[in-house]
């Protein structure tokens, strides 16, 4: 399970050092893809296979499903961390997420997310008030 917030930096070659807590689960390989809210989703190979299998169950007649699957999978890149735990983020994904040098890597349970640090801080500031005021049940969570 991916938890916490980490603050790695993007190096000049477009690589980040994965948080130590995430390395074991991602050591054999991972998949990076476009995430919602202009972040990058990071899945273990096993979790990505599970997500892909769920997508395969979507009806091909659903335009919304086709559109989502196209955007999600066309931006995917499988990567293997090097011995130092570094992984290269492809240029198209760096551009999609607007990544600068300072990053936020957050744990989101079954996946991690890579954000530009400023974008993450703005998102968090915007959403924290709603989070603290949540008193209605949220389907699947509360």
Swiss-Prot record:
Pfam families named in the record: MraZ
Keywords: Cytoplasm, DNA-binding, Repeat, Transcription, Transcription regulation
GO molecular function per UniProt: DNA-binding transcription factor activity; transcription cis-regulatory region binding
Keyword set includes Transferase: no
CC terms in the record's Gene Ontology section: cytoplasm; nucleoid
Compartments where found: Cytoplasm, Nucleoid
Record InterPro entries: MraZ (IPR003444), MraZ_C (IPR035644), MraZ_dom (IPR020603), MraZ_N (IPR035642), MraZ_sf (IPR038619), SpoVT-AbrB_dom (IPR007159), SpoVT-AbrB_sf (IPR037914)
Keyword Transcription regulation: yes
Record text on subunit structure and interactions: Forms oligomers.
Family as reported in the entry's similarity comment: Belongs to the MraZ family.
Protein name in the entry: Transcriptional regulator MraZ
Species, as recorded: Pseudarthrobacter chlorophenolicus (strain ATCC 700700 / DSM 12829 / CIP 107037 / JCM 12360 / KCTC 9906 / NCIMB 13794 / A6) (Arthrobacter chlorophenolicus)
Lineage of origin: Bacteria, Bacillati, Actinomycetota, Actinomycetes, Micrococcales
């Amino acid at each position: 399970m991916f938890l916490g917030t980490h603050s790695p930096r993007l190096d000049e070659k477009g690589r980040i050092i994965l948080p130590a807590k995430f390395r074991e689960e991602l050591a054999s390989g991972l998949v990076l893809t476009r995430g919602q809210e202009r972040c990058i989703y990071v899945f273990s190979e096993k979790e990505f296979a599970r997500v892909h299998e769920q997508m395969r169950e979507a009806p091909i007649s659903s335009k919304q499903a086709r559109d989502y699957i196209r955007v999600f999978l066309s931006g995917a890149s499988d990567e293997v961390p090097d011995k130092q735990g570094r992984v290269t983020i492809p240029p198209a994904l760096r551009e999609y997420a607007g990544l600068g040098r300072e990053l936020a890597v957050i744990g989101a349970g079954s996946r991690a997310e890579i954000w530009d640090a400023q974008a993450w801080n703005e998102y968090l500031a915007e959403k924290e008030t709603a989070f603290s005021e949540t008193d209605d049940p949220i389907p699947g969570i509360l």
